């Protein structure tokens, strides 16, 4: 069975995990109501996308 020969230091362990962080999604302002939404998606508050109403009510 494989067993580590030396203890993994905190530095090496943390360097290996640098890509496991959470990323904050980019947000854009809705052109109709000004609400923050994810880009290329329909606004949840007003239902507009690309300057047109897509969802009613």
UniProtKB/Swiss-Prot annotation:
<dbReference type="InterPro" id="IPR002677">
    <property type="entry name" value="Ribosomal_bL32"/>
</dbReference>
<dbReference type="GO" id="GO:0006412">
    <property type="term" value="P:translation"/>
</dbReference>
<dbReference type="GO" id="GO:0003735">
    <property type="term" value="F:structural constituent of ribosome"/>
</dbReference>
<keyword id="KW-0687">Ribonucleoprotein</keyword>
<dbReference type="InterPro" id="IPR011332">
    <property type="entry name" value="Ribosomal_zn-bd"/>
</dbReference>
<dbReference type="Pfam" id="PF01783">
    <property type="entry name" value="Ribosomal_L32p"/>
</dbReference>
<comment type="similarity">
    <text>Belongs to the bacterial ribosomal protein bL32 family.</text>
</comment>
<protein>
    <recommendedName>
        <fullName>Large ribosomal subunit protein bL32</fullName>
    </recommendedName>
</protein>
<feature type="region of interest" description="Disordered">
    <location>
        <begin position="1"/>
        <end position="21"/>
    </location>
</feature>
<dbReference type="InterPro" id="IPR044957">
    <property type="entry name" value="Ribosomal_bL32_bact"/>
</dbReference>
<dbReference type="GO" id="GO:0015934">
    <property type="term" value="C:large ribosomal subunit"/>
</dbReference>
<keyword id="KW-0689">Ribosomal protein</keyword>
């Amino acid at each position: 069975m494989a067993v580590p020969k030396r203890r993994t230091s905190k530095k090496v362990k943390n360097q290996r995990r640098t890509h496991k962080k959470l990323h904050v999604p980019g947000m854009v302002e809705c052109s109709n109501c000004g609400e923050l939404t994810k880009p290329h998606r329909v606004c949840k508050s007003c239902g507009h996308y690309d300057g047109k109403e897509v969802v009613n009510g």
